[in-house]
């Protein structure tokens, strides 16, 4: 069953994986980020979200900022040793490893997420699509969420509401624009070998059609 949620915010950053040092955002929201927003509003083991379309409803504008980040990572081998032996330190001293990095992020963003959900084998006997649809709409209308949804990073919170009327497409987004290869989502079908999945993103009149995970043109 289909649902449309309008989302907007001051800033967004959907980081390109090929940019290793400085953060550079994709031009528009990625399907995986859209799924994350919907799961923040309503998640249930009995349903699985599938993003169908992303409507871009604000001009694409970039700005440069500097963000504080931690340069170190927790070492999995060290963490395992601490857990097994019960001694040692397993933390990051952010005051010692903090550093500033430049980031090219989006500003003044607005999207409409069109998605549907499929029932899964984990649905309870009393679960059904109509029940889930009512819960989702009620939560969106009341602004309820399990955790604060965000645009790519928790520093950029999302405002949202149930879409009751499609905003107009900005004139500068009319026509066709090739956005290149974009992250579709992560493939968790094999927990021991999680892989990124990409698709060729083409925006037409401000609308990005999203293929299914195993659809035509999807690359692993």
Describe each PLM feature range.
Residues 3, 28-32, 85-92:
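Short linear motifs at secondary-structure transitions and domain/linker junctions
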Residues 69-71, 79-220:
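Internal, well-folded beta-alpha domain core
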Residues 19, 24-69:
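Glycine/small-residue-rich interface belts in oligomeric ring/scaffold proteins
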Residues 7-11, 58, 113-121:
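Beta-strand elements of well-folded, non-transmembrane domains
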Residues 1-21, 204-206, 211:
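N-terminal, Lys/Arg- and Ser/Thr-rich interaction peptides
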Residues 2, 51, 108-112:
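Broad gene-expression machinery/nucleic-acid interaction feature
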Residues 13-15, 62, 121-123:
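Residue-level signal for secondary-structure boundary sites
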Residues 9-11, 55-56, 70-73:
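A short glycine/small-residue-enriched secondary-structure motif
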């Amino acid at each position: 069953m289909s649902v449309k949620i309008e989302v907007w915010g001051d800033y967004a950053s959907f980081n390109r994986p090929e940019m290793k040092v400085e953060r550079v955002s994709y031009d528009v929201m990625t399907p995986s980020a859209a799924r994350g927003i919907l799961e923040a509003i309503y998640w249930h083991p009995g349903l699985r979200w599938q993003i169908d379309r992303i409507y871009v409803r604000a001009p694409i504008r970039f700005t440069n900022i500097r963000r504080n980040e931690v340069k170190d990572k927790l070492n999995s081998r060290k963490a395992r040793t601490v857990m097994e032996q019960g001694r040692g330190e397993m933390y990051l001293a952010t005051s010692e490893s903090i550093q500033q990095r430049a980031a090219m992020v989006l500003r003044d963003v607005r999207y409409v997420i069109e998605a549907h959900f499929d029932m899964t084998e984990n649905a309870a006997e009393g679960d059904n699509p109509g029940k889930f649809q009512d819960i989702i709409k009620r939560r969106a209308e009341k602004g309820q969420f399990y955790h604060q949804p965000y645009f790519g990073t928790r520093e950029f919170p999302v405002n949202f509401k149930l879409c009751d009327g499609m905003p107009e497409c900005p004139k500068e987004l009319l026509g066709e624009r090739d956005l290149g290869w974009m992250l579709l989502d992560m493939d968790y079908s094999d927990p021991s070998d999680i892989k990124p999945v990409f698709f060729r993103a083409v925006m037409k009149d401000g609308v990005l059609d999203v293929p299914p995970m195993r659809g035509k043109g999807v690359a692993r």
